Design a protein with these regions (language model features):
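N-terminal leader/propeptide segments of preproteins
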Residues: 1-48
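N-proximal short alpha-helices
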Residues: 7, 27, 31-34, 86, ...
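Generic, low-specificity signal for short hydrophobic/alpha-helical stretches with a mild N-terminal bias
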Residues: 12, 16-19, 23, 43, ...
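Short, well-ordered alpha-helical segments
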Residues: 49-57
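Membrane-proximal, non-transmembrane alpha-helical segments
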Residues: 57-109, 117, 121
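Small-residue-enriched transmembrane alpha-helices
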Residues: 103-120, 124, 128, 132-144
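Short, charged juxtamembrane terminal tails flanking transmembrane helices
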Residues: 149-154
Length: 154
């Protein structure tokens, strides 16, 4: 087992323990997303010094929450979520990863805009907007599928 896989396995076990301790409040911390981010950080840590630093940070983040999970302050929660977003931002900017479904959402909005334009041209928003939205969803879904196949999703 590689060092990175071992790190992820240990972190996953700690997160599962934390989920059990937090109970229903666990969803407020997006721990599922946290594990997806951790898996990708583990994959890039061998080649990226920032990812190696983030591994230590992620260990500390879970350790801090595990001390007294029922007495977590709003500041601790805000810090946890802020750090997770910082790490996610690094993965997106430095390693070119995208969130699953990101392109679909973006192109849905673009398609709606194009649909409004088509509705004006054809003098019928009933035709233009749904057509634009449909094209946007299809185009975004295709790009998301390509990203998934290329292993570029988080």
């Amino acid at each position: 087992m590689s060092e990175q896989t071992e790190w992820y396995g240990n972190l996953e076990a700690k997160v599962e323990t934390l989920k059990a301790q937090l109970g229903a409040d666990a969803r407020d911390y997006y721990l599922g997303r946290f594990l997806k981010i951790a898996r990708r950080i583990g994959e890039f840590a061998a080649d990226c010094p920032h990812c190696r630093e983030f591994q230590t940070l992620m260990d500390n983040m879970i350790k801090d929450l595990s001390y007294a999970p029922t007495q977590i302050t709003k500041e601790q929660k805000r810090l946890f979520l802020g750090n997770a977003n910082t790490i996610l931002s690094h993965l997106k900017k430095t390693h070119g990863l995208i969130s699953d479904g990101q392109n679909t959402g973006i192109f849905l909005a673009i398609g709606a805009g194009v649909g409004v334009s088509l509705g004006v041209v054809f003098k019928s928003p009933i035709i233009g907007i749904p057509a634009g939205v449909a094209l946007g969803i299809v185009f975004g879904a295709v790009l998301d599928m390509r990203a998934r196949k290329a292993g570029k999703t988080i």
